[in-house]
Each structure stands twice: as structure tokens, then as C-alpha cells.
């Protein structure tokens, strides 16, 4: 009998929490933002978590998702820039590398290496995103070491 009452109380408490999350618009938005963050749609997650914080400034889930989305977007942008720079370097190297092109390549390498150092690492960030950013940096370090 006591066991049944304990189970009923536990289910009731879980239902209350679920009702709270479902009825509070700020937490509803925060849950959607968390879903988009986990789906690697960082811009949508950022927008939704910002809306959730606008509704309730004390929503910790939304604040965490907002901060993590900002960091993830910086990592994604770094990776995207790295790919674009590598494409430009490949195009430059197909026609022969002039002294000016050599300086541009060196500058691109320096920018990518320095930008990596400015990225804010977090334990909550996706490991795949962090490792891809690190490998992008390593490509530019290797390229710089081999060429200069």
C-alpha cells in the first residue's frame, strides 16, 4: 500500500513539473531552443532562448542554451571560415603562387590560428564541433609550418 502511494506521489510530482513546463511560455521556448541546439540548429536555438529570457530573465535553461548557442555559432563560423580560406588557397595555388599570394596565405594561416585561440571552450559544447575546429586549426598550423 505504501509503495502504491509513493508511486502515485512520484507520478503526481512529475505531472506537475510537466504541466508547469507546458504552461509556462518561457520554459516552452527554452525546451524548443534546447531541442534546436541538440539538432545543431544554433541560430534558431539562439533566437528562441533569447525570446525565453525576454519573457523570464531567471530562466536558467534558456540562459544556458543562449550562451552555448553563441559559443557553438562561433565555432561553426570558425570552421566555415577555415573551409573558405582553404578553398581560396587551393585556387591561388593552381595558377602558381606569387609573392603577394604567399603573403595572403600566411595572413590567412595567422588569422585562423589566432581566431582559434579566441574561441571560448565549454564542457557543454558538442565534442564533434570542438574536434572539427581543432582539426581546422591544425591544418592551418601545418600549412604555415610547411610553407614558411
Where are these regions (language model features)?
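Hydrophobic membrane-insertion alpha-helices, especially the h-region
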Residues: 4-22
Amino acid at each position: 500500500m505504501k509503495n502504491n502511494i509513493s508511486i502515485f506521489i512520484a507520478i503526481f510530482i512529475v505531472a506537475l513539473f510537466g504541466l508547469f513546463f507546458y504552461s509556462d511560455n518561457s520554459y516552452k521556448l527554452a525546451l524548443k531552443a534546447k531541442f534546436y541546439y541538440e539538432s545543431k540548429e544554433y541560430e534558431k536555438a539562439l533566437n528562441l532562448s533569447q525570446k525565453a529570457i525576454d519573457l523570464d530573465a531567471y530562466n536558467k535553461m534558456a540562459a544556458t542554451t543562449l550562451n552555448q548557442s553563441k559559443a557553438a555559432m562561433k565555432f561553426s563560423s570558425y570552421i566555415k571560415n577555415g573551409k573558405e580560406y582553404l578553398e581560396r588557397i587551393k585556387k591561388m595555388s593552381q595558377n602558381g603562387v606569387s609573392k603577394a599570394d604567399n603573403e595572403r596565405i600566411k595572413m590567412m594561416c595567422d588569422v585562423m590560428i589566432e581566431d582559434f585561440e579566441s574561441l571560448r571552450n565549454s564542457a557543454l559544447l558538442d565534442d564533434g564541433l570542438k574536434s572539427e575546429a581543432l582539426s581546422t586549426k591544425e591544418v592551418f598550423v601545418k600549412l604555415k609550418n610547411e610553407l614558411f
